[in-house]
């Protein structure tokens, strides 16, 4: 939200297959101005905060898709992400009972010219392992992990959008897709 990628009013959805196994989060970056009411609802929004390098946010339309951000959950520890003009894989590798390492792989394409390569590298500094947004995601995962350690029976219900049990949602302000994925995962693990 801080940089206008995922804001109220963006066209967004969380899409899952019937089993919950496959899920995609998608959002279309809007060029519209965010309303003052929407700004009040965004905890991460900082009035007047700008990037010194505005090209971080340049989105070059590379193919016919309405989405500027897609995140595909392959398994609880593997996500394929396309954010703006970056393509990457995030893999969580358990490193002990209460520890993990986040591994990132960012991609370029053989047909990229030098300017597009620079652009992808630049955006990788926003979305990638040491990027402004990547660090925030890693911290969020740490909070979840720390929270789960305090749950006595090791079961936890994610409550964002509790009225929608599990599956597809037309908003990013929902965790119904992640609930569907974990229902599938628990079946696969025999839990």
Question: Model features per residue range: what roles?
Answer:
Residues 1-191:
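C-terminal catalytic domain of Rieske-type non-heme iron oxygenases
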